[in-house]
Structure formats: C-alpha cells, structure tokens
Amino acid sequence: MDQTHKKIHWRLGLCKCKNISLVETRESYRSLHPTNQPYRSAIQCSWADDNFVTPEEEYEPSLPSSESPTDSCHADHESPDSPKYQQPAPGERPECEIYKDLCSDPQTVDWAAPPLKIRDGRHQELFLLYAEITLFSHWASIKLVEWAKPLELIYVIVQTWEPKLTMKAKAANANFYVTFSNRHGFPYHAVIRRTTTRIPNQMSLEFKMLMRSK
C-alpha cells in the first residue's frame, strides 16, 4: 500500500470505518475507461449503525441570497462548441444547474432539506471528512489538501426521497450538496452520494467536486 492510500485509510479511520477500499484510483480508472468520461472517486466503507447518532439540527428558513457565493459550472463541463460535448438526454439537466437551483431557493425543491447547522460533533466531523476526501479526489494531492485545512462547513443540502425521515442527515440513500471553505476563505462546492445495499452495515460513497465559487 503506497503512502497516498495509507493516508486515505487513516483519514477514513476518523469516522470509525472498517473494511475500507479505494474502488478506483485515478490511474486505474484511466486504464479501465479509456474514454473521456469524468473521473469520480468512490469509496466503499462499512461501519456499525450506532455511529449514526441523531444530530441536533437547526434549520434556517432559506439561504442568505446576499451572502451566497457566486456559482459557476466547473471547467470540466464541455461547452457545446467542443468536439467532446455530449448532448444530454431528454429531460436531463447538468448537475451544476441543479446546484444553482438549490443554492438560489431550496424551498422550491420538494426533496431538498433547508440548509442545516450540525451541532453534533460526530456528524460535523463526518461532513468535514467528506469535504476533505472530495478535495483529494479532485486534486490527487495530499499536500494541497493539507494546505487547504482546516476546512469549515458553510451549509449542507440533502437530496433524498426517503419520505418518513425527519433527520435527513441520517438518510441511507441521499445526495449531500456540501459547501465549505478552506483556511484561506475560498469556498468550494461538492456532491457526495451515499447509497446502501442489502448487505447489512455497508454503504458506498461517491465524491465529486462540482464547482468552485469565484
């Protein structure tokens, strides 16, 4: 195991994960997928359910529009003039546009919880860990991640279709739209997809740096 994988394992140990494996590294992805498909970092992890203690959540009525960062699609989205541009399927919208809608007015989206403040230390640490791994999957550099730390959560928006869930931070299958800043004050946007299977106490995580505020 190289130093990069060792450090990722150590980071994931903060949330008491077990049986952790990097599903795909950037190099193995390129060898397995020669096409120009966007790289996504995925990590499989299993842990006991008692790690997910119900957090104390405080909801705000809406995002502060005057203080919200200016959002823009990331550079890895090809323009229509590019030869690599792929026409989206009918009814499909780019993730960056979905994120803009969420940031502008999350109340208009029925499956999006309002921005939440997390006071429970274990849940705050978990979302910060998600943000840290997202930075690593985007930069592929431990040094740059260390340069950016400590990270600070700005807000989290949860996308889930689990109807009877009051604490959406505990959703077994959800997309987490996380906005966070580094120690230099630069804000970043990330999408973390958490899915579960029928295997007890096992989940799959996908991390993607969607855009950066200017």
Swiss-Prot record:
- Superkingdom of origin organism: Eukaryota
InterPro entries the UniProt entry points to:
MS5 (IPR006462)
Pfam families from the xrefs?
A: protein_MS5
Chain intervals for the UniProt region annotation (Disordered):
56-92
* Family listed: Belongs to the UPF0725 (EMB2204) family.
This one is known as: UPF0725 protein At1g19565
Q: Which organism is it from?
A: Arabidopsis thaliana (Mouse-ear cress)
